[in-house]
A protein has these predicted regions:
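Ribokinase/PfkB-type carbohydrate-kinase core domain
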Residues: 1-11, 57, 61, 72-87, ...
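Glycine-rich phosphate/adenosyl-contacting loop at the front of the ribokinase-like
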Residues: 1-61, 66-70
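Short alpha-helix plus adjacent loop in nuclease-associated cores
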Residues: 93-96
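Short, glycine-/polar-rich solvent-exposed loops and beta-turns at beta-strand/coil boundaries
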Residues: 89-91
Length: 144
């Protein structure tokens, strides 16, 4: 029997700027390249667990915007059940701006967006599956 993993966490669209070094206050530097990727610790954990053959219940919250629609399709493509992917009409999908140096150092600015609206009320929706889960994973980046 495969373990069932319940993941409660964030989903962010990451804007990753590869830079030669961290810049100083007031200084502008040019990025060597820019990559847009789907990320967020919660989503990464859910997708990796699914790829390892586990049954995954992933609760997150996306905005109803272009990024949210794209992210939803990405999660479905990765085999994540959309039943627990909630949507917020007022807030955009979470985003993170990641500065990544050639030495592998990073600085991250995160805007939680819809992730920040995940609530205790939303968690009550999971009441039917809490007992089924063998493992519970949370990142403590959401306000629940």
């Amino acid at each position: 029997m495969s373990q069932k993993i319940l993941v409660l966490g964030n989903s962010n669209v990451d804007l990753i700027f590869r830079i030669p070094r961290f810049h100083h206050p007031g200084e502008t530097i040019l990025a060597e390249n820019l990559v847009t990727a789907f990320g967020g610790k919660g989503a990464n954990q859910a997708i990796t667990s699914k790829q390892l053959g586990r049954k995954v219940i992933f609760m997150t919250k996306l905005g109803i915007d272009h990024y949210g629609e794209s992210y939803l399709q990405y999660l479905i493509k990765k085999g994540i059940d959309q039943k627990w992917i909630l949507r917020n009409r007022r807030l955009p999908t979470g985003m993170a701006l990641i500065e990544l140096t050639s030495k592998g150092e990073n600085r991250i600015i995160a805007s939680p967006g819809a992730n920040g609206s995940l609530s205790a009320r939303d968690l009550k929706l999971l009441s039917s599956v809490w007992k089924e889960a063998n493992v519970f994973v949370a990142q403590l980046e959401i306000p629940v």
